[in-house]
Amino acid sequence: MYQNIFDSHAHYNGKEFADRDELLPRLFASGVCGIIDVASSMRSTRRTVELSARYGPVYSAIGVHPNEVKDMTDADYDTLRELARLPKVVAIGEIGFDFYWDASGRDTQREHFERQLILARELDLPVIIHSRDAAQETYDLLAKYRPRGVVHCYSGSAEMAQEILKLGMHIGFTGVVTFKNAKKAVKAAAAVPLDRLLIETDCPYMAPEPTRGVRCDSSMLVHTGGKLAEIKGVDLQDLFDRTRQNACELFGIEL
């Protein structure tokens, strides 16, 4: 059994995990040592802090996804600021741009991406970045504000990955890297040094091959990790050890 499996991006706070109280203990007993449970709305922000308060290996990222920011208020920022004082809140996220769905409008997305980047700087917290069909726009704001953090679920080019790395960011890979058509993600993973690499599920989404199409959970990181270990030319346990260390250093966690 593999140890030190750290899932740097999951959504166990969601309705898809009504069985979380049975599932999470099984995961912790099977090698999963830590999980960053990530919010996407104010509602899920509240749920994730409740979840991390109940489970020692679970930590929270709080913030509002670009598809949800159209309803954000000044009071929501006050709430985020207050919740960020909790000891198990370790990041602001997920925040960023989503030009694929574009549910909030691009100007509104930019406004709240910037406001949440400023909030993270004020709180001295790393950020978890969502970027879909907005690589250059995301890079431009990261270059402007220079946060610590991770661009999660990366599937962009190796060239853009190198530019993001120059800003001091980490890059996270999901089960997408196992897909047969994921040539860009594979090339990008090859370009990311081990000390900047994070591994994640984005569960319940993004189940890797050979489990694609079912609800994802952190146990499936053995498949994603196996592919990343193959790409990087390292032993799978060594990859888990290194990505655990990376996550703990980035998010200020002592395990």
Where do the model's predicted regions map?
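Mid-domain alpha/beta scaffold segments of enzyme catalytic cores
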Residues: 1-255
